[in-house]
Each structure stands twice: as structure tokens, then as C-alpha cells.
Amino acid sequence: MKLATLNNGKRDGALVVVSRDLSRAVRVPQLAATLQAALDEWAELAPKLTAVYQQLNDGACADAFPFDETACLSPLPRAYQWADGSAYVNHVELVRKARGAEMPESFWHDPLMYQGGSDSFLPPRGPIVMGSEE
């Protein structure tokens, strides 16, 4: 099943089900307005979303429209949090060294993780607004 978040002018976008070949999509407000809402009720909604996905792939959704990935936001434009388990030990070592802090031996074999800000994710194909160099 393929899901996406369509930019509808609201902060969290609108949930759409996308066809296997990425050519068509269908809105599913009767099931969940946003991807976060679908995830919150996943046990109940996953089978219903899967049924819509199958109907879409079978050409049985009259309200399907051409899918345009550039019209999408990030899947979860805002999230409660995100945690990344790919902290680089060499980077951690350099930062700690710059602060004059010892590098615990456990950092070389215990998993490292960091948490990032998640209040606003950029769309996958959206512009990155940069400040002027002037």
C-alpha cells in the first residue's frame, strides 16, 4: 500500500492513497483526514486503506485523480518526535574533544541515538528557502 500527504493548504495536509504505479491517487477523508490520524487508528484503518488501495489499482475508484508527487508534503509534515539511530561515533568523539570531554568507551559499542526537531519538515520536492548572502 502506498500513502502520501497531499498539500491542501493546511499544516498537516490530506491523506491520499496512491496507486502501485504512482499514476493515480484518491482522497480518503471518510477514513482519515491525515496520515497521522490513520497511524493513530492503524489497527482499525489499515484493512480499510488496503481495500481502497486495491480498488484504486483495479481502476474501481471513480474519484481517483492523476498523482503529482510535487503536490505532496512530507508524509508527516509535523511529528511528535523523530529519533535517529545513525549517530556517527567519530563525530561524537570530535564534538566531545572540542568541549574537553572524555569519550566513554561504551560509545564505541553501545548504540547511539539523537532526537531532532520535528515541528516542520520540508516537502520532498519543495523549495529550500535560504537567507540572502548580502
Protein language model annotation of sequence segments:
Residues 1-7, 11-12, 20-21, 29-30, ...:
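Active-site microenvironments in enzyme catalytic cores
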Residues 16:
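Short beta-strand-centered aromatic/proline hotspots
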